[in-house]
Amino acid sequence: MVVFSKTAALVLGLSTAVSAAPAPTRKGFTINQIARPANKTRTVNLPGLYARSLAKFGGTVPQSVKEAASKGSAVTTPQNNDEEYLTPVTVGKSTLHLDFDTGSADLWVFSDELPSSEQTGHDLYTPSSSATKLSGYSWDISYGDGSSASGDVYRDTVTVGGVTTNKQAVEAASKISSEFVQDTANDGLLGLAFSSINTVQPKAQTTFFDTVKSQLDSPLFAVQLKHDAPGVYDFGYIDDSKYTGSITYTDADSSQGYWGFSTDGYSIGDGSSSSSGFSAIADTGTTLILLDDEIVSAYYEQVSGAQESYEAGGYVFSCSTDLPDFTVVIGDYKAVVPGKYINYAPVSTGSSTCYGGIQSNSGLGLSILGDVFLKSQYVVFNSEGPKLGFAAQA
């Protein structure tokens, strides 16, 4: 573990800026997420989200979760519960609102190649006059909740914040499932995992970050997701106004294409820390925290009335319950997730029973630290090493 203080980070940032000065195209930039309108309602399939997260990493989806997802257990909700964080991106001639996902490596979008019935409510990608279709290339993604998308591949111009590339692989959807069509706030996904897991065939393509990182002052991006508010992505630099204390760094394991790392333990509420560390993935594209069964059971033993519900497809409890904090130990740093973040959402409209933000990883062998965890942290994803940095949000 390496701990960088704000002062050290500033000195490193200054030295980087000096060494980069001869190359005027190198830069750093911030891109803000967009909040959904407060009066916009939509349907969220909670067990479907859970199933998709498990399947994304090759996990087994329990039968109870499959059945709950197929029944469409849902809550109609405005922009709360932080199910997705959307960011404006210019793709070709279109500005789209995309889900930035550190757990995948594809940039796929709704396009004008979709049937008209699947286009309604979405902003669409239209290839620019300079776009090149990659003949014989295709992509096809399926998730555990039954959702899927597939289509063609183009080489086109993509702009995020202050950085543009005219040679980014853009995966244009020509077929898409109803689960995605119904989410009219979301026009696609921008993957920020390692390019080794890009799904384009016959040859994998590079992520946007890998394509543009040579233009940045430093080959990194930092994430500040927020609770009940839009968050921020910083590319190429670390903003010391967004965190308190020091950034604790740990080696990232990219062997499976994800931003993986090893923790050094955990604690629940005011209890003492367990020294049993676990392997984890930092994933902005997963909503929940998915942990080993023994940790999940230990957590909900501290929640009055909590139970694992077959019907709901996960742990539930009374919405009025005060939940204990959950802390992940990384070196000498303790990343605290407030209990209120773990009270994720009612299991259905008007219900007094809520769905937990911590659920089982179903024997996956890896824990997934999704948005419920990340929105309490300022997290640095540095491709040099690679390494991950964690600090409490300011």
Curated annotation (Swiss-Prot):
Keyword Iron-sulfur: no
GO cellular component: extracellular region
Domain Peptidase A1 span(s) in chain numbering: 85-391
Signal peptide: 1-20
Gene3D superfamilies per the UniProt record, alphabetical: Acid Proteases
Record-annotated disulphide pairs: C319-C354
Glycosylation site residues: S129, S304
Propeptide regions on this chain: 21-69
EC number: 3.4.23.18
Subcellular location(s) of the protein: Secreted
GO MF: aspartic-type endopeptidase activity
InterPro entries assigned to the protein according to its UniProt record, in alphabetical order: Aspartic_peptidase_A1 (IPR001461), Aspartic_peptidase_AS (IPR001969), Aspergillopepsin-like_cat_dom (IPR034163), PEPTIDASE_A1 (IPR033121), Peptidase_aspartic_dom_sf (IPR021109)
Active site feature: D101
An individual GO BP term: proteolysis
pH effect on activity, per entry: Optimum pH is 2.9-3.3.
GTP-binding among keywords: no
Catalysis: reaction(s): Hydrolysis of proteins with broad specificity. Generally favors hydrophobic residues in P1 and P1', but also accepts Lys in P1, which leads to activation of trypsinogen. Does not clot milk
Subunit structure: Monomer.
PANTHER family: ASPERGILLOPEPSIN-1-RELATED (PTHR47966:SF2), BETA-SITE APP-CLEAVING ENZYME, ISOFORM A-RELATED (PTHR47966)
Function recorded in the entry: Secreted aspartic endopeptidase that allows assimilation of proteinaceous substrates. The scissile peptide bond is attacked by a nucleophilic water molecule activated by two aspartic residues in the active site. Shows a broad primary substrate specificity. Favors hydrophobic residues at the P1 and P1' positions, but also accepts a lysine residue in the P1 position, leading to the activation of trypsinogen and chymotrypsinogen A.
Family label: Belongs to the peptidase A1 family.
Protein name: Aspergillopepsin-1
Organism annotation: Aspergillus phoenicis (Aspergillus saitoi)
Origin organism lineage: Eukaryota, Fungi, Dikarya, Ascomycota, Pezizomycotina
